[in-house]
């Protein structure tokens, strides 16, 4: 029996779906990736809560977090308009700057789509079988009619929370430090989500070269906790 999950116009339903899809317990495997943070800690570039907050805010404002938000927004629009998603999926995959970043986004995207099928939607038939994580999240949110601004804010917060969880395991800070950073990042996340909601593909671009290099260097790190 096929169960059709309708597009939601109810803000509470939209919120519940976002909280489920982007929860740390949603089986996308996010807990196993550090996005290069593990190498940054290893090399002494991130040593405390202040440095971690700075690292995260620039990833969100001008780094991979920003690019992923732009890709997420464009995927949402394609889903809402019934447009083809293969081109944006190919671009998102190509933008992965290293082997482990590519693995991180593709495996998370595939796992996200597999788990999100618990909320049936025709969008799954329009997506390629292998799909980068921001494209998967944006397309599924758009397919279910979840508002774009809320989807982007939740997506960016989930990105930061995953790295904050990694920072605890890496002994950069503790739970009190993490909660303080979460509170401090709220304006950054809100502002970046608002910019991304108005963005186009011409707004893609990042300037966090050290973070990208750390992701590359992690590939040869001998002792590690994370896959990226």
UniProtKB/Swiss-Prot annotation:
One Pfam family, short name: UreF
The keyword Cytoplasm is assigned to this record: yes
Molecular function terms, GO-annotated: nickel cation binding
Cellular compartment(s): Cytoplasm
GO-annotated cellular components: cytoplasm
Subunit organization: UreD, UreF and UreG form a complex that acts as a GTP-hydrolysis-dependent molecular chaperone, activating the urease apoprotein by helping to assemble the nickel containing metallocenter of UreC. The UreE protein probably delivers the nickel.
UniProt similarity note: Belongs to the UreF family.
PANTHER family to which the protein is assigned, alphabetical: UREASE ACCESSORY PROTEIN F
Function: Required for maturation of urease via the functional incorporation of the urease nickel metallocenter.
Protein name: Urease accessory protein UreF
Source organism (scientific name): Brucella ovis (strain ATCC 25840 / 63/290 / NCTC 10512)
